[in-house]
Regions:
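Flexible, solvent-exposed loop/hinge segments and secondary-structure transition points
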Residues: 2-182
Length: 182
């Protein structure tokens, strides 16, 4: 018996079978890689917290060890907060998220115990345009937050060039990525 490949029923059945096969394969791959993906996401979060708190590490294993030994989670129903002590000073890190141009930006902001000076910032995830909003991952952008004084209870982002003062609570935005910088 010869199959009529020009028949609409054949086309629909063939498309359904191929689609079903690919869905099964992709589901199996997704399930097989899920633990690794979760582990890597947790590692990115740990490294971002350590970076914001200015805790150095040389490897992924060292980062995990330092996080387990030096950083404690602060019990809070509303926010995800961590703390450490460095040079006799307590440093707090807050996980934050907000809207960028293409999706949610999730990061870590570390402040001193008086909440008056930013100790550092790092980003856990972002999906901004490479070369524009994606530049928030670059060290020059993150470094300008370090030791910035919190003015009027908040740090603002200036879209124009600032004078580089750490006392005014302003940092430079990424040129061409105004929405991401906010």
């Amino acid at each position: 018996m010869k199959i009529d490949r020009e028949n609409k029923v054949y086309t629909i059945a063939f498309t359904f079978i191929i689609t079903f096969a690919f869905v099964i394969v992709l589901s199996l791959i997704n399930n097989a890689t899920e633990p690794t993906v979760k582990k890597n996401q947790e590692l990115l979060k740990v490294k971002a917290i350590l970076n914001a708190m200015d805790i150095s590490y040389l490897s992924d294993d060292e980062a995990l060890d330092k996080f387990r030994n030096d950083v404690q989670k602060v019990e809070n129903d509303k926010y995800e907060i961590y703390k450490t002590t460095s040079g006799g000073e307590e440093i707090y890190a807050l996980i934050f998220s907000g809207s960028g141009l293409w999706g949610t930006i999730t990061g870590v902001l570390a402040v001193d115990s008086s909440l008056s000076t930013i100790k550092g910032i790092d980003f856990i995830s972002q999906s901004e345009t490479p070369g524009l909003g994606g530049r928030i991952e670059e060290n020059w952008f993150k470094d300008q937050f370090r030791d910035e004084k919190v003015a009027d209870g908040m740090v603002s982002v200036s879209v124009t060039k600032t004078d580089g003062s750490k006392e005014d609570g302003k940092v430079d935005a990424v040129t061409g990525a105004t929405l991401t910088s906010k």
